[in-house]
Structure formats: structure tokens, C-alpha cells
Amino acid sequence: MTIVYDVTGHKGGGGKQHTPQETPDSLHSLAKIRILLALGEGEFEGITSASELRQRVYLDGTPIQNADLSENFPGARVEFRPGTQHQDVIHGFSAVESEQSVGVKLENGTPWVRQINDTSLDAVRVRIGIPALYTSEDNGDLVGGRIDYKIVVYTDNADPREFTFAAVGKTMSLYERDHRIELPPNVNTGWRVEVHRITADSTSAKVVNDIQVQSITEIIDARLRYPLTALLFVEFDAKAFQNIPRVSIKCKGRKVLIPNNYDPINHTYSGDWDGTFKRAWSDNPAWHWYDICITERFGLGRRIKPQMLNRYALYQIAQRCDQLVSDGNGGREIRFKNDMYIQSQTDAWTVLKDLAAIFAGMTWWGNQMLNIVSDQPVAAVSHTITNASVIDGRFDYASGSQKTRYSTFAVAYGNPKNHYDDAIATGQRVELVRRHKINRLDITAIGCTRESEAQRRGHWALISNQLDQQVSFKVGMEGLFFIPGSVVAIADTNISGGFETRGGRLLSDPGTRTVLNTDSEITFRPGDKFLVRTDSGNVETREIASVNGNKVTLKTALDADPIPDQPFCVDGDDIQLQKFRITDLEYDDSTSTFSVRGIEYNDSKYDAVDNGARLDPGIFTQVPDGVMKGPESVTITPSQISSQGQLITNVDIVFPPVKDAVVYEIQWRRTSLQNMAVQWGNDWVNIPRTASNGAHIPNVFSGNYQARVRAIGMGEISSPWVSSAITPVEGRLGGLNAPIITNAISGLHQILWKWNHNNAATDISYTELEVRKTGETEWKFLTNVPYPGAEYAQTSLEFGIYQQLRARVADKIGNLSDWSAPFEGQVSDKVDEYMKGLDDEFLTSEDGKRFQEAIDTVPQGIYEAMLTDAQQLFNARAEYKGIYAEIKVAYNVAADAHKAVAQLETLIGTRLDDAEAAIHTLQTAQSTQEQAFAQYQQTVAAKFSEQEAAIQQVQTATADVAGALAEYKTQVAAQFGQQSAAIEQKMTSSFNHAGGSATYSLKAGVTYNGTYYDAGMQLSVVTEGDAVKSSIAFKADQFYIMHPSNGSLSSAFIVDGGAVYIDTARIKDATINFAQITDTLQSNNYDGDTRGWRLGKDGTFINLGTGNGGGMKQTNTQISVKDGNGVLRVQIGEITGSW
């Protein structure tokens, strides 16, 4: 089938007298741009009129219609669909089209071909382009032309369908036309589309008639409504733009679920909310957050159900968003609103956090719910926390570094006056600029289209950055009651200064609603408030009326009963409680504890953000700032009183009180009145710390006195010392006599010092002792011995050293005597005493007693089952005339209210006449209310008549309230008649309240003719109190240490009986009570001629010095001296005339 289409233009006229003329263009492209935009998930708030719609739609930022109804784009067509379920179809977009560019020039005889395999298509649209079409006549006229072409469609094996077209007329620029070609239905493999040029190709420059295929579009016809999708359709003349313009619309967005008592336009609430919703448009960010959570099509509704959200907490947040605040220009506006347009798929958690950030919110998952909290003021704290209610009483604090301290901000927001392009709102906190200089914080305010709100967000960020102190602590199962976002009050004595009790716990008997029983007496000031959680589940705050010991009386009764052992805090104006908002909870299953973290909370923050009010930093400590000042003056005032007929002189030290001082440290000293140069004989005497501004010293000696005082504030901040003038005082005559050291008794590693006090005074307090090694100059403090003690044992000293001691006495008010004369003593240097003492010390100790224990050398074979009342699990036995082989497995289990026990026994045994062999195991586990016990025992034994051999292994573990014990023992034993031998290896570790020990021993024993002989070794470490001793002991008649030499062994060290033999010894420092020389004693540099010395067994002593020449020789009858040349110079005794 052939269809012919003609498109005809017109040509110019003629005349007899001809002037070349050009025919006007008669071919014009008339292209329309049609755009269909999916604005978002519906349903959107509707647009009431066509005029309103045209004024809300923009092409490249220009509205289609102005407010005065004048048109900027005449003929433009605009349609809007809000995204309802059954919305109308937008006409003009009745198909789904896919356009593909081609741009191929057609030539006669060479068609353009495209194979189409998508059998779901309904039609194709072929766009033809003619760059220019004209003919230049011989007379110079420029007229139109003609070009013919056809489109042919081939379908499977059917006859082709042919469509013929012609373009007639003139154009000097690109002329385009579209041809929609219906495709035959019911095909199997698809279609082939061909475009042919019928007109012959031009061969003359006078004829211009090129033609080309511009594009092909695949079309599927449909009447699409796009339910639940808001749509915008725009159609306009393509000649109005060089490129496709940006299309935008200013409209209200998606309708969301809001409370049924809420007016979203006026942002008001009527009456109480019953928890039900209605669907309407709203710019309240809280309900947008809720909508994202529950919507299944594009949100989290497939995973989050409405019952998994706290709608009432969200209702409170939404009301805060709608509260009116200053707009900075004298007006009022709602606090937060959301103009966010989500245009792309994003991680759900990120979207929720971004939405929550609009109202300073935090999203978290807990208790099988998705929770949301906002940074907003709280009416009351949720918990009271003290050092007594956290693990180890410890709070850890942290804050940001100087680099993260910001003072100015730049907030980017969408400016509606400039088509919502980004604009910048800037601001600063003056006090932060003074402190941190200029450090700008850059923020993008999501969903913000108001400069005033951008300002508030910037100030909120700066103040939050300023209030960035973080706290972390650990609690037990009380952490179950902590909720992220809740605010807690903390009374930390380390912060408050530690001098006052501002928190604790109620007793197990908490008291009444008016009078509460606390675990300690609190510090109370008028107006202080008592905070404690009650049975209502809330923390109640009441003003304190009075405090009497551990009883606190409230001015107003609590609303509910107090809870036993509940933490409490005291809040006041002078010292306020720290408050933190909980941000994170982490449970440690291994310790059953919660790690809690929080960020600083300040009630004044929110008024500072909304209205620019001053931020109140709070007072949380009594520790003063800066340096503590000392007293302005210190005065010594003597006074006299008569007591029992005696005149007694006292001294008072007085000074004015110091601001912020908690206690004072006072010292004084004295010298004699005759000491005009004031060389102090006494060191400073300390008076115990006092909170009063003075001290009293009774019954003083005469002398020149001086005192000094310093003030101590919170946190142990101390002032400089302030001294008094030197003041003469007439008091008791004389002074304390120096004690007399009477004896120094030598002992093993100790000296027992004894002295006489040498004083008639009855008010002696103690004797001060100082020591030094003989030959040293510096004295070191040893101890103070309370009166009337007159001896002291100085222990843990080195062997044989000499020590010097000096002493002085002090009376009860601090007067000191002069030092006594030094007295010298020596630590014992008698080796036999040390050896006997060390022997006794070791052998009488617990590990020494274990070392002396004899082992049982008789084998302990087990050939029969031991669990007589056990239940039998398995028994296999073969027997023939008294000869048998058997295997037994038995068990015993029992449990009652006081004990649980389990035992398992195995026995493998054989017997033939007098020959027996067995392998036996017994495993026991037992638990009682007082002890846990486990033991594994294995015995391998063989017996023939009276000969027996056995290997036994026992492993035992015991634990109870008193301690723990673990023991591992292996014994190998053999017996022949009455003779027996055994080797035992034993490892024992134990610990209890008194101390602990670890011991390893190895013993070998023989019982021969009724007498026991053994050898062994033992390693042990024993703790007793603060002392720890380790030892290695050997027991043997002979002890050898050998080394290989030239292929054989030789002894380097031998102990035989009580004698020690050493082959070669090098000793750095030796103390010898008695030495026997069996050959020669000489120096290591002795060469027999020029240097060194030598003492021979025959008594000859030769001393040659260090090699400078000369020498001396001494025998039992002669002394001879020679010079450096070997010439004899002196000879005494037997005169021989020769060296």
C-alpha cells in the first residue's frame, strides 16, 4: 500500500521586464516543548485556580503569568495534578516515548534502515530534517523546490507498508517535520523501518535539496494517571528558548498525618488531643518526621509501625516548633518550620537525622521503639546521681579543643526572594569572640527558608558548642532506667570541692514524706532544695526546712513515698547541681554494667537562643578562682595564769579570717632569750589543721617565739606563709634535756638501740631517732618512739655494717630537746649465727615444714571399685576358674537443698593367682553452700605376691569463702618385700585472707631395713601480710654442679655433708670468719719479681708492691728488704746477706 502526501508552498510571479527576486520562505518548523514532571509522592495540597497555577509555575525563573494577569509566555499550557488515587489523565502525554537521535543524510538509492525488536510498541515517530530547499533560476530568481521521500515498514513475512511524502516550497534554514507511523500489531520478531530518498541527488549548485533523518521515537500508547504522584505538565513554543528551560513550581507539598486538633495554617491547637490524626498539609517538621517513619511507599513503614513510635512525645516537640518567638524585626513567628524538598533516594537514617536536626532533635532505637527527643527545656530532672550511685564513685569529664571553639557562624538557607537559591546568614557571640577570637562555624540549615530562623540555628550551634562538657560514668542495673534525651542531676564532690556533702543515698528505712533518713549529714543552707525519686517514678524537689544529723525535714511533704536506698541530691544558689542530657547508653554483658554518656545541659540556653538573653554559666564549685590569699597579719600574744599556786605562761597565735579559706595550717618555733642572733634551736612545730582563726599553746618555756600561718581553700589551694614578728616570752625556765643512748645490741640484720630519757619532765610526747652509716655525714629520719618507750629494733640491715644513732625528745606542745651524742652500733657479723637463724626461720615456716615431710614409699594400688553405693553404668567380666578380667564404669549423682555431688569411676583389672594389674580412675565434683571441690585421681598398679608397683596421680581444686587451693601430685612407688622406694612430684598453689603460697617440690625416698632416707628440692614463694619471701631448698648428702670438660664431666661445685668444695671461685666482696689456706694465697698480678704479693703455706710472705721497684720478704725468722735493682738493703733476724 502506498500513501502519497504533498506539502505545497507558493512561488513568486513574473513580468516582461525582469529583476531577479527571491521568493519568501514558505516552509517553517512549528515545534512545541512538552514536559511532564513528577513533583513528588502525593497527595499534595491543591491549587485553587488556573490563574494561581500559572503564576506559581516558572520557566527559567520567570512566571508564566504575572500578578496583573499579563502573560510572559503566550500560548503556554499548564496542568497540575495533586497526586490523588483517581486523578485525571493529562492530555498530550498519552504515550510513553523513547526518542533516539540519528542525524543521517539520505541519498538516493541508499535508504536509512532501523530494526525494531520491541514488540510492545504501538508506533514510531520519524523526524525528517531539510537543512535548506531552493532553486536558483537562470534569470537570477531564487525560488522553491521539491523533494520526495518515503518510509517503508516491513513486518515479519508480510507485505511492506509504504508511506510517500513530499516537501514543496522554499526554506533557507533547517525545516523539520515528524511522521507518526502506526506499527502493525501481532508481530513475532518486530519491524524494520526504512527511509528512502525518491528525488535524485542534486548535481548542480543551483539546486539545494538535501534531506536527513533527525531522530526516531519509539511509542507505547497509554492513558497514564500516575496515581499518588503529584504531576506538573507544561507545554510551550520551542522558539522561546535556545535550550530546555528549568521548570519550577511554588506550591505546598505533600499532605501528612497531623493531630486532629491542630490547625496547620495558623499553627494553633484546640483542646486536648485524643491521639487520632487527620491528613493535611503542614510545615511542622515533627509531623514530616512521623510521616517518613510510617509511610510504606517511600519511607520506613514496612519496618516501623505506628505503635513503635511515641506520638505523644512527638506532639510535645511539634508544639514547641509552633511556639512564637521574635523574628528579629519586631514581629513574631513560629520557632521551626520545614521547607525541605527531598529529590533523591537517600539512606533512611540520614533522612531521619536531617529532619530531626531542624528542631534540634536526636533519633535513637531502644525498647523496640524508634524514639525521638529534642533539645528543649525540661520541667524536672529524671534522675539524681551522686558519687555513691556510680561505680568507683567516678565521673569522667571531657570537652572540645581550642580548635573546635567557634565564635561566629555562617548559615546557608534557601532565600525565597531569590527563587530559594542559597543565601548566607551570619552572626557572632561577642563573649566568645573575646575569648576565642574569630573562628567561624559553617552550617547548612536543612529545610530553612527564613533568615531569622537561620540566625537562631546559628546561635544554637554556637551556644551548644560552648556548652560542650561531656560526662561519662558507669552504673549497675540502674542503667535500665536511663533514657537518651533525659536530663539528670549530678552531685560530684570532686567538682563541688569535696568539703560539703551535697548528695548520697536514703537509708533502707527512708523515713516519711516529710522527714527523710540519709546515709550522712548533709551541708544545708537556707533555700537549698532536696531532690529525690519517689514511688511516683518522678524526681521531686522540695525546699529543706532543717537538718538534724542524718534526718532532713522538708518544708512541704512529698507527693509519694520515698524509696529505700534511693540517691538524693541537694541543690542551692551557692552550689548548683550539674545537669547533663543523656546521649548514649552502652551495656557490658560481661560485667552487667552500663556505660552512660551525657552532654552539658543549661536551662538558660534556650532563652539565649530565642531572645538573645544572657547565658547563665551556673555555680557548681566552691573552689575559688586564682591564688589563695594569706592572713593580713599574724600576732603572738603571751598570757599568764595561776594554777595550783604556780604561774603558768601560755601563748596565743591569732590572725584575721581569710575569705574563701576552709582551714588554716599553723606552725611555731622557739629559741632561747639569750640567743640574740636568733638561731632557732627548734624546727617548725605543726599544730593540727583548724577552721578557727587562732591557736593556743599552754605552759610554754621562756624564749623568742615566732609563728606562721597559711590559708587552705577548696581543692587544697593554699596561700603563701604569713609570719609573725619575733616575740620574747617569759615562761618556764630551762628546757628539755637530750636523751642518752646507752646500748646497741647486735642481731641478725638488726641493731637493738636503747636509751635513757634523761628528763624529769612529765609531758614528754615521743623520742625522735635519726641514723646514718658510719662515715656518712647526712642524718636520716628513722622513727618516733612514743613515750615512755626507750628501745627500738632497727631491722632489715646489711650484714655486719656499722650504724650511728642520735636521739632527741619532744614534749606535748612541740618543744624539742637538743640531739644526743652519736652512738655507734654494728649488725652481727657472725656467720654461724646467721646460718642457725636462717635454718630455724626456714625449717619452722610452713614451706619448711612441707620440705621436711617424708613421703610414703609403699605403693598404693587400687584393684577394687571404691564407689560401693554407685549406680553401675557398664560391667564387662570374663572369668575362668578364679582367673578374671573385667571393665567397670560406675557413677554417683546426688543433689539436695544443701549439696550437689557427681562422681564417675572406671576400673580395668585382671587377676591370675598372685598376679594382679589394674588401671583405676575416680572423678569427683561437689558443691555445697560453703565450698566447691573437684578431684581427679588415677592409679596404675601391678602386684605379684608381695612385690608391688604403682603410679598414682591426684589433681585437686578447692574454693570456699576462706580461700582457694589447687594441688597436683604424682607419685611413682615400688616395693620388694619390706624394702620400698618412691618419687613424688607435687605442685601446690593457695591463697586465703592471711596470705598465699606457691610451692613446687620433688622428693625421692627409700625405706631400707626400716629406716627412711630421702633427697629432694623445693621452690616456694610465700606471702604473709606485706612480706613476700621466695626460697629454693635442696636436701641431700651430696650436692653436685658439674660441667663438661674435654669430653668428660667435672665438678665445679660440691657440697658433701657440711663441707663445700669449689674448683674455681671469683668473689667480689666476701666476709670470712675463719679461713684455712692449704697451699698459697697471692694477688692476681703477682709475677715473682716486680709486683704483687704472695703468702705461702710455709709462712713466707713476699710483697713486691705495684712494680715501682723494691720488695719485702718475711718468714718466721727473717725480714728482708731490697731496692729496685735487687740489692739487699735491710735484713732483720737471721742474717744471711742475701734476699
UniProtKB/Swiss-Prot annotation:
Signal peptide: none annotated. InterPro entries: GpJ_CSF (IPR015406), GpJ_HDII-ins2 (IPR055385), J_dom (IPR032876), Viral_Tip_Attach_Protein (IPR053171). GO terms for cellular component: host cell cytoplasm. It is found in: Virion; Host cytoplasm. Ubiquitinated by the Bil antiviral defense system when the Bil system is expressed in E.coli MG1655 and infected with this virus, or when this protein is expressed in a strain with the Bil system. It comes from the Viruses. Keywords: Host cytoplasm, Ubl conjugation, Viral release from host cell, Viral tail assembly, Viral tail protein, Virion. Pfam families: FNIII-A_GpJ, Phage-tail_3, Phage_Tail_Tip. Coiled coil: none annotated. Its main location: virion. Attaches the virion to the host receptor, inducing viral DNA ejection. During tail assembly, initiates distal tail tip assembly. During virus entry to host cell, binds strongly to host receptor in an irreversible attachment. The binding induces structural changes in the tail leading to viral DNA injection. Belongs to the Caudoviricetes tip attachment protein J family. PANTHER family: FELS-1 PROPHAGE HOST SPECIFICITY PROTEIN-RELATED, GIFSY-2 PROPHAGE HOST SPECIFICITY PROTEIN J, PHAGE LAMBDA. This is Tip attachment protein J. It comes from Escherichia phage SECphi4.
